């Protein structure tokens, strides 16, 4: 029977993890391990595990490893060695206490950014291996409390912020009224069947950032888009269950999202500036549901802005003058390939664009992704210490004249705000839509 792997001391006590561990036995861990490995994995896992030659090339790609002065425990292969390989080596017969560090490593020390996979000579997807560990942890009931609360919200309300149905509709009507002070004829169409576009957002927008809905409504109306938003559950495209390991809820969320679009008979879905939600429809939720492709086309806000500007449906009155640098979200760029379209949009609306180095698919993660920021305040310092290299990257861009950082992803936005304050960078952090709304031509 395996004991806890020797690693750094754990000082964070998480009620979600501690309560789960208290109810574990070695037999239960073994049973869950065998269920996941034998019924939910296959050749992909076997090939990855047996192909790795421990060359260490993945290490130099990892922001956690680089930010911790190349401590091998923070290397991607080190994280897999102390989690999944421990479980595989002992065929799941692990002491309950050993699961604490396994869970903390899987949930809080890997952003699932997949930068390491780009540098692996065999293309091993370590994020997938860590997700297998998270799946086992979820099945054992040892998920960080804050992240589990978000998954509970998804399960109960079909959104991640416990937003009630009437609160959602009230927020849309409120933002419509606010925007009508600027454009009297503006509408946010609800439940309009046959529209060209269903616009979907993530839970924090109606809860904390309603101005983003306002801005989108202005963009849609000025561009003359035939659009709608749903009034029923299915409006939230986010999916933190994807990161907690709750694949069943992940599947429910994706099905509800697409069922809502199908009910409204829209031609396509436009998603707001969110990275993980985008990944959930092109990489994970669709796979769990057995879909080769989404049943209704989905585009990210970056693609939507790109088409509006390229087709001159939105015109720029005057470009944003301050120095701007652009963060490339992992799930949008490394996973979604939207690096050139995001630059087209940025250059179209900003007069002084300063490239961050490295950039595009080689950019460093924000440190919030993969559900790590959703593990809550207890792990904020883990994120800050684990992403010093991102702060250095941002400081270098600032030294070249950047005063504004564009982050076209909600989790990135929040994670970069934390880095900005923690390291005293003094940058203004904006969504692309913030600046597009600011500089676009609007009716008099």
Segments the model singles out, each with a brief description of its role:
Residues 1-107:
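Ferredoxin-type iron-sulfur electron-transfer modules and their immediate structural context
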Residues 23, 39-49, 84-287:
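Iron-sulfur-cluster electron-transfer modules
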Residues 52-58, 62, 110-116, 120, ...:
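Short cysteine clusters
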Residues 60-87, 118-137, 371-386, 414-425:
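Iron-sulfur (Fe-S) cluster-binding segments and ferredoxin-like electron-carrier domains
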Residues 123, 204-294, 333-348, 354-444:
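Cofactor-cradling patches in redox/metallo enzymes
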Residues 194, 320-322, 402:
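Phosphate-coordination loops involved in phosphoryl transfer and adenosine-cofactor binding
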Residues 198, 325, 405-406:
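Conserved beta-strand elements of the Class I
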Residues 298-310, 314-336, 349-352, 365-368:
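Catalytic cores of enzyme domains
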């Amino acid at each position: 029977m395996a004991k806890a792997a020797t690693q750094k001391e754990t000082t964070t006590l998480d009620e979600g993890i501690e309560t789960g561990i208290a109810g574990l036995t070695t037999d239960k861990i073994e049973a869950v391990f065998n269920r996941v490995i034998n019924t939910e994995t296959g050749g992909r896992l076997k090939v990855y595990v047996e192909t790795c030659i421990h060359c260490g090339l993945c290490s130099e790609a990892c922001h956690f490893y680089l930010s911790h002065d190349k401590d091998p425990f923070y290397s991607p292969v080190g994280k897999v060695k102390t989690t999944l390989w421990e479980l595989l080596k002992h065929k799941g017969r692990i002491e309950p206490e050993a699961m604490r560090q396994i869970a903390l490593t899987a949930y809080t020390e890997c952003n699932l950014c997949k930068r390491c996979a780009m540098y692996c000579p065999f293309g091993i997807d370590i994020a997938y291996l860590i997700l297998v560990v998270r799946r086992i942890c979820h099945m054992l009931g040892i998920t960080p409390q804050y992240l589990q609360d978000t998954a509970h919200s998804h399960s109960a309300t079909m959104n991640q912020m416990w937003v009630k149905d009437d609160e959602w509709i009230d927020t849309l009507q409120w933002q419509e009224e606010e925007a009508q002070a600027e454009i009297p004829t503006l509408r946010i169409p609800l439940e309009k069947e046959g529209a060209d576009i269903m616009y979907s957002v993530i839970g924090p927008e109606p809860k904390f950032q309603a101005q983003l809905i306002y801005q989108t409504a202005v963009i849609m109306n000025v561009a003359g888009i035939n659009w709608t938003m749903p009034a029923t559950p299915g409006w939230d495209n986010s999916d933190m269950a994807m990161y907690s390991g709750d694949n069943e809820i992940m599947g429910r969320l994706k099905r509800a999202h697409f069922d809502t679009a199908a009910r409204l008979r829209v031609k396509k879905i436009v998603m707001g500036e969110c990275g993980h939600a985008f990944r959930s429809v092109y990489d994970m939720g669709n796979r769990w549901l057995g879909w080769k492709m989404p049943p209704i086309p989905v585009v990210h806000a970056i693609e939507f802005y790109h088409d509006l500007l390229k087709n001159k449906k939105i015109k720029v009155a005057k470009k944003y003058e301050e120095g701007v640098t652009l963060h490339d979200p992992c799930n949008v760029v490394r996973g979604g390939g939207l690096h050139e379209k995001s630059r087209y949009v940025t250059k179209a609306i900003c007069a002084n664009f300063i490239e961050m180095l490295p950039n595009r698919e080689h950019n460093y993660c924000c440190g919030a992704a993969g559900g790590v920021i959703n593990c809550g305040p207890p792990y904020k310092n883990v994120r800050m210490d684990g992403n010093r290299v991102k702060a250095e990257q941002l400081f270098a861009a600032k030294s070249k004249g950047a005063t504004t950082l564009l982050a076209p992803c909600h989790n990135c936005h929040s994670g970069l705000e934390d880095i900005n304050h923690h390291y005293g960078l003094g940058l203004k952090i904006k969504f692309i839509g913030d600046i597009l709304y600011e500089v676009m031509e609007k009716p008099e």
